[in-house]
C-alpha cells in the first residue's frame, strides 16, 4: 500500500536522527529485528563515477572495458516498469545546499506501480536513461541493488520486485551511517566487484580528501600521507577531489557488467 504524504514528511523530519538509529543496530536483539524488518535480503553496490576509473584490461582489447554507468543503463533497458522520484529523501531530510534535491532515485520493477503518484512518475526507457545521465552530470554517484528499506518507506512491494538505483551525494547519503551500523547490515553495502582504490606516492598529505568528501569517512591523513580504511565503498570521490591526482581507482578485470548482472538479477525481478 502506497504511503501518504504525511508519512514521508515524518521521515524527512526524522532523517537527522539516522546516526542514532544506526547505533541501535549494534544491540543484539534490536539489531536483528531492524535487520529483518528493513534490510533482509539486501545486496547494494556503489558504482564509481565513470571519470574516476581506470580499467586494467589488455591494451589490444580496449572495447571490452565497461564503464560503471553501463550497469545502470543495462537494468533500465531491461525493466518493464521504470519510476523516477521527484525528490531525494536523503537530500530533503538533510536540506542539501550542494546537489539538486529534485534528482531523485530511479526504481525498477512491477512494485513501482504501488508508489504514491505524488512522489514521482512512471517514465519511458529513454526518460529514465536521461535522468540517470543528468544525475551523473550533476556529480552524483549511483548505488544499485535490492534495498528493502525503500520498499518499506514507499509502501511498494514485495521488495523482490523493486530494484533501487540511488543517485547519491557525499553530504546527505543515508549510507553515511555505515560506520555506525552493525556488521550484519553494514556488509550488505559494498563496492563494485574488482574495484581497488590506492593512494600513490604523489600524496603530500594535504588533507583535501578527508574534508567532507567521503560519505563513509573512509579516508584520513596519518602522518604525511592519506590512508584509506576498510569502510571504503569505492565511490571515487576522493579520486576526483585530489589536487595532486595522487589517488587512483582501478578495476582489475574487464567482466564487470556480466558479474553485476549475475549478482543483481536473482535478487530482483524487474520484468
Where are these regions (language model features)?
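N-terminal cysteine/histidine-rich coordination modules
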Residues: 261-262
Amino acid at each position: 500500500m502506497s504511503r501518504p504524504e504525511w508519512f514521508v514528511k515524518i521521515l524527512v523530519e526524522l532523517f537527522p536522527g539516522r546516526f542514532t538509529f544506526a547505533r541501535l543496530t549494534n544491540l543484539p536483539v534490536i539489531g536483528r529485528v531492524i535487520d529483518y524488518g528493513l534490510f533482509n535480503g539486501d545486496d547494494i553496490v556503489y558504482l564509481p563515477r565513470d571519470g574516476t576509473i581506470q580499467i586494467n584490461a589488455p591494451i589490444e582489447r580496449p572495447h571490452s572495458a565497461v564503464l560503471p554507468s553501463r550497469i545502470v543503463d543495462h537494468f533500465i533497458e531491461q525493466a518493464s516498469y521504470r519510476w523516477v522520484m521527484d525528490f531525494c529523501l536523503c537530500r530533503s531530510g538533510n536540506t542539501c545546499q550542494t546537489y539538486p534535491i529534485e534528482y531523485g532515485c530511479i526504481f525498477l520493477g512491477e512494485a513501482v506501480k504501488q508508489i504514491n503518484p505524488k512522489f514521482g512518475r512512471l517514465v519511458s526507457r529513454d526518460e529514465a536513461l536521461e535522468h540517470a545521465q543528468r544525475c551523473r552530470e550533476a556529480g552524483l554517484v549511483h548505488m544499485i541493488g535490492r534495498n528493502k528499506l525503500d520498499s518499506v518507506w514507499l509502501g511498494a512491494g514485495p521488495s523482490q520486485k523493486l530494484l533501487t538505483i540511488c543517485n547519491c551525494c557525499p553530504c546527505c547519503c543515508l549510507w553515511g551511517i555505515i560506520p555506525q551500523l552493525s556488521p550484519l547490515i553494514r556488509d550488505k553495502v559494498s563496492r563494485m566487484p574488482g574495484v581497488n582504490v590506492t593512494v600513490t606516492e604523489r600524496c603530500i598529505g594535504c588533507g583535501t580528501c578527508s574534508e567532507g568528501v567521503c560519505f563513509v569517512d573512509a579516508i584520513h591523513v596519518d602522518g604525511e600521507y592519506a590512508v584509506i580504511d576498510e569502510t571504503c565503498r569505492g565511490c571515487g570521490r576522493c579520486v576526483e577531489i585530489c589536487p595532486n591526482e595522487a589517488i587512483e581507482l582501478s578495476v582489475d578485470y574487464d567482466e564487470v557488467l556480466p558479474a553485476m548482472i549475475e549478482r543483481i538479477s536473482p535478487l530482483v525481478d524487474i520484468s
